[in-house]
């Protein structure tokens, strides 16, 4: 259980409690649970991911950004991704790739000790449909439009199979939350089996409606 990555991630109050309650299902499955810590600065992983994302997204966005008739049709976040990509040099991207490799080595070492790594699926509960994205979580400002989803980049950067399963409902409004089950590289079947076993153990409540929708 990696939780909030040793207090690095901004997490809304109630999220960790909801997820940690769901973790008890793994104990009922016969698994041994431990709190763990990644031996790598998560901010380095974020910086690498952000640069690589700028480059990847820009390949789709730049044709529209360069078209005067379509530029203004792009949402601000898409334009920002492409404009940030234009500031990157080849050296920047090589450094980001090297950082990703360093992160991968540290991440994979965790599987010397564990079969699966568990993280929250999100850093905050569902928010109002009129809110484009959370500008803050607790006292911490989100400095990009996807910073509130930082918790999902680790499976992406490592290339490890990951699945999200329901963790229950939490927070003052009883909103849904999930946990990520992340396995070793190419261990997709193991991850699916773990998710299936989890859902069988959680069968009592997994199909229940959230509190806000109950009669």
Regions found by a protein language model. Name each.
Residues 115-117:
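Short, Asp-centered acidic motifs that coordinate Mg2+ and/or phosphate
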Residues 31-49, 80-83:
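Short connector loops at secondary-structure junctions
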Residues 47-53, 134-135, 178-181:
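Short low-complexity, flexible loop/linker segments enriched in glycine and/or proline
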Residues 1-2, 8-9, 16-32, 94-98, ...:
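Structural helix-boundary/capping segments
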Residues 39-41, 124-125, 169, 212:
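Conserved beta-strand edge residues that scaffold enzyme active sites
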């Amino acid at each position: 259980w990696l939780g909030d990555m040793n207090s690095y991630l901004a997490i809304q109050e109630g999220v960790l409690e909801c997820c940690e309650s769901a973790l008890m299902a793994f104990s009922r499955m016969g698994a041994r649970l431990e709190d763990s810590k990644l031996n790598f600065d998560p901010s380095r992983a974020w910086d690498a991911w952000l640069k690589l994302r700028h480059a990847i997204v820009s390949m789709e966005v730049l044709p529209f950004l360069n078209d005067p008739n379509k530029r203004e049709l792009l949402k601000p976040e898409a334009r920002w991704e492409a404009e940030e990509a234009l500031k990157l040099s080849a050296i920047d991207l090589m450094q980001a790739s090297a950082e990703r490799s360093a992160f991968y080595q540290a991440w994979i070492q965790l599987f010397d000790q564990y079969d699966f790594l568990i993280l929250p699926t999100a850093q905050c509960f569902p928010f109002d449909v009129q809110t484009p994205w959370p500008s803050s979580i607790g006292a911490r400002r989100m400095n990009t439009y996807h910073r509130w989803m930082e918790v999902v980049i680790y499976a992406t950067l490592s290339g490890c199979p990951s699945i999200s399963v329901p963790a229950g409902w939490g927070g003052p409004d009883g909103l849904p939350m999930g946990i990520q089950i992340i396995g070793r590289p190419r261990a997709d079947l193991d991850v699916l089996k773990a998710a299936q076993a989890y859902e069988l153990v959680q069968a009592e409540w997994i199909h229940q409606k959230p509190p806000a929708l109950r009669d």
